[in-house]
Amino acid sequence: MNHIEKWLKSTPTFDCGNKSIEEKAKDITKGYEEASDKARSLFYFVRDEIKFIPHLPVGVLESYQASKILKARGGMCIQKAILLATLARAVGIPALVHFVDIRNHRVPTKIKEVLGTNLFPYHGYNELYIDGKWVKAAPTFELKVCQDNRLIPVEFDGKHDALLPSHDLGGNPHIEYLQDHGRYENIPLDKIHDAWTQAYGLEARRGLNQFIEVRKAKSRHLRR
């Protein structure tokens, strides 16, 4: 197996051989022949149809399994990146998750208060191998989140890098890229959770997850 082919294989998290993943990937890319067009269509599906939920899953493998993320229709940056990489692999595009620490200067005040910081270790974005080169893409925030918060949405054409922007629509600082952790063939759960514990502490992580669950419950109640 060469250095490109290994980013096509199915793993416990990148379960691209799962029936639901295969069917969804084929449905999204139906009618497209070029890898860049397929990648673009998959990107926008994950960006906008998979809701960004800023929770911090404790080390349960299923929380990071692409087929489970697809079924849940929501997840944090790492989970959305896992799903995009897996859908891409399902249609023959080598893809991976790249990890980096970021500082989000536009993080909601309540979340910053709970965590005690705007630092987010091990943010995950994608790299996809298209037309002989690796292209970066971050499907983190859906369009509605960007519109509601005056953020610049990430737009991806399947050919050029598309990462989270440094400033928002008002010119205020948004994302600051810090330490690069690189690529991993398997999701480094131990390193991720150690970094989260060091940055936030266990109580803050539990507090954030409880806060998100309350918000989700309120949202379900309003939809009734």
What do these predicted ranges mean?
Residues 54-122:
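Active-site neighborhood of thiol-dependent amide/isopeptide-bond enzymes
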Residues 19, 57, 74-75, 159-161, ...:
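Short capping/connector residues at structural and topological boundaries
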Residues 2-72:
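Secondary-structure boundary elements
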Residues 25, 35, 39, 66, ...:
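A sequence-composition feature that detects small, non-aromatic residues
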Residues 2-3, 9-13, 102-224:
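His-Asp-centered catalytic microenvironments across diverse enzyme cores
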Residues 44-48, 86, 90, 124, ...:
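Residue-level signal for well-ordered alpha-helical scaffold segments within enzymatic catalytic domains
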